[in-house]
Swiss-Prot record:
The modification Phosphothreonine is found at residue 535. Activated by DAG and phorbol esters. Phorbol-ester/DAG-type domains 1 and 2 bind both DAG and phorbol ester with high affinity and mediate translocation to the cell membrane. Autophosphorylation of Ser-735 and phosphorylation of Ser-731 by PKC relieves auto-inhibition by the PH domain. Changing residue 293 to W: Increased ability to bind DAG, no effect on phorbol-ester binding. The gene is PRKD3. Keywords: ATP-binding, Cytoplasm, Kinase, Magnesium, Membrane, Metal-binding, Nucleotide-binding, Phosphoprotein, Repeat, Serine/threonine-protein kinase, Transferase, Zinc, Zinc-finger. It comes from Homo sapiens (Human). The keyword Metal-binding applies. It catalyses: L-seryl-[protein] + ATP = O-phospho-L-seryl-[protein] + ADP + H(+); L-threonyl-[protein] + ATP = O-phospho-L-threonyl-[protein] + ADP + H(+). Changing residue 158 to F: Slight loss in ability to bind DAG and phorbol-ester. Pfam families: C1_1, PH, Pkinase. GO terms for biological process: intracellular signal transduction; phospholipase C-activating G protein-coupled receptor signaling pathway; protein phosphorylation; sphingolipid biosynthetic process. This is Serine/threonine-protein kinase D3. InterPro entries: C1-like_sf, DAG/PE-bd, Kinase-like_dom_sf, PE/DAG-bd, PH-like_dom_sf, PH_domain, Prot_kinase_dom, Protein_kinase_ATP_BS.
Length: 890
């Protein structure tokens, strides 16, 4: 039958076809009516049903014989049709034998019914009425199937985020980017660039989908829809849903069109014409799948098809060059490399790590919902070194997101209950021993009236517990009572916990009532661990006889006023909430905490010294050393530092959230210009203080701009100085620092950098705040992108943003450092020299009672401006002098 005679309701398929066992000779010359024996799996022959049960039953059950595989299927009687049966056959083959699929299988299979009473046992089915209950239906491949059909097996490609360095299986180049770097085939697992999607051959092996042929499908009526027509290509849409199962997602990309595939297959294959080639991007040999190492002349490239390989592999490559394939009149093979300098450690990328480490499917990002376009309407990207055309109305940039660095931003599993059980106690105020059902979680110890009710006698926050000690005070014990087992000491009361009955053996009956030394010791151990959850359990003192508690761990405490105290345990001063992860930096994880005596909320960065070599310990203390010398309202305040042999604890003030969270939670995932001006001015004022002291932050990004409150116009403070450097006004540094998405080109290229590095980051912050996307695409050179205004500032959303904002961004995102704006020049830019912004800042300074952003010398100028333009000039602003005047004069 013709390929164009498929039912209108069924989309044209590129499903895997009948397995090799379906027909012993699956070739165009095979007989269209050759079937295998109708023997059942139990050895007996099937007998056709003499009556059709559709009149009395709502479903029809029959057997499908596909080669040596037999499946029992059930179809609703009212839905039984020849088209439905063929759909079901395609689905079974697609699931059990995906590597045997071919183009247009639906139109090239024949169905035969086994009739044992007929001389010709196999009877061709031309109508669904010929299928009866219990029949055996043989699936046979038609002679219309050609060799080309078997060789065309399109890939099923999905946008994928890779966690390890991965290379394109078409061009051999690395897949660049932070997320959604490329496309992965669900069938064979190969990886491709998005730009290579329309060039790759339709040769999917389907090895990842293969199901054992002797394993039945989950249900007899399972029906899997056939793939979409190969003439249509699915592209990402801006509106979509996430967290779809890989098997349920709609394929987002396809390979080259079928007509091109057939044209290529007709070409004569000739030997490759190899020439020595220098690669500017990390590339692998497409024969042995290993990295082409070296600075230049790393390997050989075919002049015609651009196949890349080692010199040693050139003689082993099959002679299958097809020349340069054109698509819509344009070259479809890989073009010349674009010059994007990037340093890659060859030791970190090998044949094992370059692929296979990223097979875990991640939830599809929101852009993966599909709509369909005819490929003739699509412009194929050129790989030549040129500026690519960008959509004039929308941005192709990566959406703004939280960038995670070396330490995974993971939250400790929050256990609602650490320990629970009956326990007895009395207090320093009441010597009557009471029995309650204790429940210990990560933040408090609650004494319930019973084990099932919600009423409780007392709640003891862990942050109020000053220390746990062995039994020392027996003055309050009742006469004739047994002594307690340990003491919980708070600022207002002492809890004497447990009852030591003198029996060292374990008594389950007494333990269930809260009496006994062993049950009390288990509670003491659990509470000690809850008080210091980030300390390894092996390091925590658990024996009641130990009086030093945690003091053997903590060796010193360094306070911001330079006082040093020996043997001070951080758990006696602060309570760390392990399930309250505020964020993670390069060197540690930040937890929420509370000062035990005052109840003040703090943020505690816990740095694991064991993660870093001894020679880097000085770098770990760099943040503390810098913060100790910084006292500015726009910079997070350091309270103190604790150090143990294993960890460093940096205690800082706790703020409400960060700027990135504010951006992402906004209505359009971007900020209005008014709020952006307000926050950027504060960032620049804090940077001015840093640069005046020759301190460069080196890792400025929205995650490191903290907000003091949830107000629409909040106070902002800079944090995370782990990368900060002391750099003089005319000095340069070369060490690699910071987060790549916000770093200036000179750092990424390992060139010398100075304090202007922070100004580039400010430009990126302004860009992402106003647009909600990163300014640069990972696949293109920054110079080319900056010069392409259509790429940098697409009408959506930049038509709504003032030209002054764009001008400031352009002056900050200058590749040449000497052309980049300084702090003072940025503060003087017309975009920030705005009367409304000045009013917002003055209102904020009046609210907090401190003037440190604006300067009193500007008051007269703005008063004249208000008078000239008939604007209201408030008189209630505070007039206190700027504190910066006393320590700097920039």
């Amino acid at each position: 039958m013709s390929a164009n005679n498929s039912p209108p309701s069924a989309q044209k398929s590129v499903l895997p076809t009948a397995i090799p066992a379906v027909l012993p000779a699956a070739s165009p010359c095979s007989s269209p009516k050759t079937g295998l024996s109708a023997r059942l799996s139990n050895g007996s022959f099937s007998a056709p049903s003499l009556t059709n049960s559709r009149g009395s039953v709502h479903t029809v059950s029959f057997l499908l014989q596909i080669g040596l595989t037999r499946e029992s299927v059930t179809i609703e009687a009212q839905e039984l049709s020849l088209s439905a049966v063929k759909d079901l056959v395609c689905s079974i083959v697609y699931q059990k034998f995906p590597e045997c699929g071919f183009f247009g299988m639906y139109d090239k299979i024949l169905l035969f019914r086994h009739d044992m009473n007929s001389e010709n046992i196999l009877q061709l089915i031309t109508s669904a009425d010929e299928i009866h209950e219990g029949d055996l239906v043989e699936v046979v491949l038609s002679a219309l199937a050609t060799v080309e059909d078997f060789q065309i097996r399109p890939h099923t490609l999905y946008v994928h985020s890779y966690k390890a360095p991965t290379f394109c299986d078409y061009c051999g180049e690395m897949l660049w980017g932070l997320v959604r770097q490329g496309l992965k085939c669900e069938g064979c697992g190969l990886n491709y660039h998005k730009r290579c999607a329309f060039k790759i051959p339709n040769n999917c092996s389907g090895v990842r989908k293969r199901r054992l042929s002797n394993v039945s499908l989950p249900g007899p009526g399972l029906s899997v829809p056939r793939p979409l027509q190969p003439e249509y290509v699915a592209l990402p849409s801006e509106e979509s849903h996430v967290h779809q199962e890989p098997s349920k997602r709609i394929p987002s990309w396809s390979g080259r069109p079928i007509w091109m595939e057939k044209m290529v297959m007709c070409r004569v294959k000739v030997p490759h014409t190899f020439a020595v080639h220098s690669y500017t991007r990390p590339t692998i040999c497409q024969y042995c799948k290993r990295l082409l190492k070296g600075l230049f002349r790393q390997g050989m490239q075919c002049k015609d098809c651009k196949f890349n390989c080692h010199k040693r592999c050139a003689s082993k490559v099959p002679r299958d060059c097809l020349g340069e394939v054109t698509f819509n009149g344009e070259p479809s093979s890989l073009g010349t490399d674009t010059d994007i300098p990037m340093d890659i450690d060859n030791n970190d990328i090998n044949s094992d790590s370059s692929r296979g480490l990223d097979d875990t499917e991640e939830p599809s990002p929101p852009e993966d919902k599909m709509f369909f376009l005819d490929p003739s309407d699509l412009d194929v990207e050129r790989d030549e070194e040129a500026v690519k055309t960008i959509s004039p109305s929308t941005s192709n940039n990566i959406p703004l997101m939280r960038v995670v660095q070396s330490i995974k931003h993971t939250k400790r599993k929050s256990s609602t209950m650490v320990k629970e059980g009956w326990m007895v106690h009395y207090t320093s105020r009441d010597n009557l021993r009471k029995r309650h059902y204790w429940r210990l979680d990560s933040k408090c110890l609650t004494l319930f009236q019973n084990e099932s009710g919600s009423k409780y006698y007392k709640e003891i926050p862990l942050s109020e517990i000053l220390r746990i000690s062995s039994p020392r005070d027996f003055t309050n014990i009742s006469q004739g009572s047994n002594p307690h087992c340990f003491e919980i000491i708070t600022d207002t009361m002492v809890y004497f916990v447990g009852e030591n009955n003198g029996d060292s053996s374990h008594n389950p009956v007494l333990a269930a009532t809260g009496v006994g030394l062993d049950v009390a010791q288990s509670w003491e151990k659990a509470i000690r661990q809850a008080l210091m959850p980030v300390t390894p359990q092996a390091s925590v003192c658990t024996s009641p006889g130990q009086g030093k508690d945690h003091k053997d761990l903590s060796t010193s405490i360094s306070v911001s006023n330079c006082q040093i105290q020996e043997n001070v345990d951080i758990s006696t001063v602060y309570q760390i909430f392990a399930d309250e992860v505020l964020g993670s930096g390069q060197f540690g994880i930040v937890y929420g905490g509370k000062h035990r005596k005052t109840g003040r909320d703090v943020a505690i960065k816990v740095i694991d010294k064991m993660r870093f070599p001894t020679k880097q310990e000085s770098q770990l203390r760099n943040e503390v050393a810098i913060l100790q010398n910084l006292h500015h309202p726009g910079i997070v305040n350091l309270e103190c530092m604790f150090e143990t042999p294993e960890r460093v604890f940096v205690v800082m003030e706790k703020l409400h959230g960060d700027m990135l969270e504010m951006i992402l939670s906004s209505e359009k995932s971007r900020l209005p210009e008014r709020i952006t001006k307000f926050m950027v001015t504060q960032i620049l004022v804090a940077l001015r203080n840093l640069h005046f002291k020759n301190i460069v932050h080196c890792d400025l990004k929205p995650e490191n701009v903290l907000l003091a409150s949830a107000e629409p116009f909040p106070q902002v403070k800079l944090c995370d100085f782990g990368f900060a450097r002391i750099i003089g006004e005319k000095s340069f540094r070369r060490s690699v620092v910071g987060t790549p998405a916000y770093l200036a080109p000179e750092v990424l290229r390992s060139k010398g950098y100075n304090r202007s590095l922070d100004m580039w980051s400010v430009g990126v912050i302004i860009y992402v705040s106003l647009s909600g996307t990163f300014p640069f695409n990972e696949d293109e050179d920054i110079n080319d992108q900056i010069q392409n205004a259509a790429f940098m500032y697409p009408p959506n959303p930049w038509r709504e943003i003032s030209g002054e904002a764009i001008d400031l961004i352009n002056n900050l995102l200058q590749v040449k450092m000497r052309k980049r704006y300084s702090v003072d020049k940025s503060l003087s830019h017309p975009w920030l020299q705005d009367y409304q912004t000045w009013l917002d800042l003055r209102e904020f300074e009046t609210r907090i009672g401190e003037r440190y952003i604006t300067h009193e010398s500007d008051d007269a100028r703005w008063e004249i401006h208000a008078y000239t333009h008939n604007l209201v000039y408030p008189k209630h602003f505070i007039m206190a002098p700027n504190p910066d005047d006393m320590e700097e004069d920039p």
